[in-house]
């Protein structure tokens, strides 16, 4: 939060959204900086490592639907981006992550944002 506040022209992606253990702190940074910045979005939630383990439970770096849905709701549809982390994983893993995002109970607009439009905006390509 302090770094984002001190470097107001820099954009951040908080990969793993703090993971299981620091999720609430990361959510606070995302929301705090969304509401006080002149650019509506400078701190993003990186949603690449979000698959639960084989038992359906989150591990150190993944998030459950109980965390993802409030993140998207509280941070607004433009808070999350996909695809910056884990570029070395296999295609099947990436497909499973995309399908997980598509299966969330969120609007099609939110899905499109997470899967590309929010990153386009962050990079000034829109």
PLM segments and residue spans:
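Catalytic pocket-lining loop regions of alpha/beta-barrel enzymes
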Residues: 1-81
């Amino acid at each position: 939060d302090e770094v984002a506040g001190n470097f107001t022209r820099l954009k951040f992606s908080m990969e793993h959204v703090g993971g299981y253990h620091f999720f609430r702190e990361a959510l606070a940074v995302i929301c705090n900086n969304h509401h006080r910045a002149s650019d509506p979005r400078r701190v993003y939630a990186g949603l690449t490592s979000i698959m639960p383990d084989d038992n359906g439970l989150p591990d150190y770096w993944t998030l459950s639907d109980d965390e993802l849905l409030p993140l998207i709701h509280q941070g607004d549809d433009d808070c999350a981006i996909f695809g910056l982390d884990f570029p070395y994983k296999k295609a099947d893993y990436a497909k499973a992550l995309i399908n997980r995002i598509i299966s969330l109970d969120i609007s099609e607009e939110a899905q499109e944002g997470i899967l590309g439009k929010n990153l386009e905006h962050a990079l000034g390509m829109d």
